[in-house]
Amino acid sequence: MIKNPKVLILTAHYGNGHVQVAKTLEQTFRQKGIKDVIVCDLFGESHPVITDITKYLYLKSYTIGKELYRLFYYGVEKIYDKKIASWYANFGRKRLKLLLQAEKPDIVINTFPIIAVPELKKQTGISIPVYNVLTDFCVHKIWIHREVDRYFVATDHVKKVMVDIGVPAEQIVETGIPIRSSFELKINSDIIYNKYQLCKNKKILLIVAGAHGVLGSVKELCQSFMSVPDLQVVVVCGKNEALKQDLLGLQEKNPDALKVFGYVENIDELFRVTSCMITKPGGITLSEAAALQVPVILYKPVPGQENENAMYFERKGAAVVIRDDSEVFAKTEALLQDDMKLLQMKEAMKSIYRPEPADHIVDTILAENHVEPNHIPIKSPALAQSFT
């Protein structure tokens, strides 16, 4: 039995999702009395220049680099076993060995497909349990390694795919993707309407525009949607200050029809009152939408994991996927007018959702390592003025 285990969570800053999952798991461990938890961006610390270049290319995949990313994602999948594995397995190894020697963790968790630890286990025989937490509704071979002790996945579909490529079923646990605890709390929606100055008697369209050019022609779209009767449009610009300033002029013309925000800390509040949401199909965003049963319109998925996520939600009836700019307004307006379709999409989201995934993952890891959790009650956060 490990009395006070040290937990090392390895992640990477490609998008916010992997890091967000790592932080959620860290918080969950701490809530259960496990205080010695370290989160490390192994790639960023090991090869900062290469990491900056690849992060830049990743962000460009949203605009000019879609075909390049398609070739990378699906090409690596095909040749991974033959050519890429040995090189990738040693990426970050020097930093990893120093980290393991200095910190001596009892448990290692990956929220990004980093196989340096299982490869080190294979080559040196070190005994340390390794867990992979997959952050999408699909699986890429780069996540798979014989020395990984257990995989935590979003759905039974992902589990079946992994079994088909040779992963033993008993090593895979269907938990859902960890999301922030705020998405699983009960909140009085009246407070939210008042806080964001929204009208309870109108439908609300939430557009999560983000900072990376995810959604094109946002201003033109807002102008079109503002003409729809009994509709309020809420745009979250994230850290895209230029977009926010561009849209504030529109808001001044008709503040009842358009609300513009920058970064919103408690974005779950807006999820709770929206009729549907236009967003990109990241695994964490979709998991959060499923938790609160928000119908989603997925805008031009990038080839790779985003496209796989989008196709899964589309098959399940939880999403409308738009691949052409000219379709955005018409398909969104049609959905907003179809209450039966919106209800069906909510039910589909409910069927996808797995409750308390972070707790499920952490409890499983602690039980397997014979650790008795010491639960620390967490109070529900107040609705603070946490937006810009």
Swiss-Prot record:
Does the record carry Magnesium as a key word? Answer: no
What is the superkingdom listed in this entry's lineage?
A: Bacteria
**Keyword Lipid metabolism (UniProt):** yes
Instruction: Please give the chief subcellular localization of this protein.
Output: membrane
Q: Which reaction does it catalyse?
A: a 1,2-diacyl-3-O-(beta-D-glucopyranosyl)-sn-glycerol + UDP-alpha-D-glucose = a 1,2-diacyl-3-O-(beta-D-Glc-(1->6)-beta-D-Glc)-sn-glycerol + UDP + H(+); a 1,2-diacyl-3-O-(beta-D-Glc-(1->6)-beta-D-Glc)-sn-glycerol + UDP-alpha-D-glucose = a 1,2-diacyl-3-O-(beta-D-Glc-(1->6)-beta-D-Glc-(1->6)-beta-D-Glc)-sn-glycerol + UDP + H(+); a 1,2-diacyl-sn-glycerol + UDP-alpha-D-glucose = a 1,2-diacyl-3-O-(beta-D-glucopyranosyl)-sn-glycerol + UDP + H(+)
Stored CDD domains = GT28_Beta-DGS-like (cd17507)
Give the metabolic or biological pathway. Glycolipid metabolism; diglucosyl-diacylglycerol biosynthesis
Q: State the EC number(s).
A: 2.4.1.315
For this UniProt record, the keywords arranged alphabetically read as follows: Carbohydrate metabolism, Cell membrane, Glycosyltransferase, Lipid biosynthesis, Lipid metabolism, Membrane, Transferase
One GO term in the molecular function aspect is: 1,2-diacylglycerol 3-glucosyltransferase activity
Where, per UniProt, does this protein localize? Cell membrane
Q: Which GO terms describe its cellular component?
A: plasma membrane
Its GO biological process annotations read:
enterobacterial common antigen biosynthetic process; glycolipid biosynthetic process; lipoteichoic acid biosynthetic process
Q: Which NCBIfam families match?
A: PRK13609.1
Q: Which PANTHER family match?
A: MONOGALACTOSYLDIACYLGLYCEROL SYNTHASE (PTHR43025), MONOGALACTOSYLDIACYLGLYCEROL SYNTHASE 1, CHLOROPLASTIC (PTHR43025:SF3)
Its biological function?
Processive glucosyltransferase involved in the biosynthesis of both the bilayer- and non-bilayer-forming membrane glucolipids. Is able to successively transfer up to three glucosyl residues to diacylglycerol (DAG), thereby catalyzing the formation of beta-monoglucosyl-DAG (3-O-(beta-D-glucopyranosyl)-1,2-diacyl-sn-glycerol), beta-diglucosyl-DAG (3-O-(beta-D-glucopyranosyl-beta-(1->6)-D-glucopyranosyl)-1,2-diacyl-sn-glycerol) and beta-triglucosyl-DAG (3-O-(beta-D-glucopyranosyl-beta-(1->6)-D-glucopyranosyl-beta-(1->6)-D-glucopyranosyl)-1,2-diacyl-sn-glycerol).
Family listed: Belongs to the glycosyltransferase 28 family. UgtP subfamily.
Name of the protein this chain belongs to: Processive diacylglycerol beta-glucosyltransferase
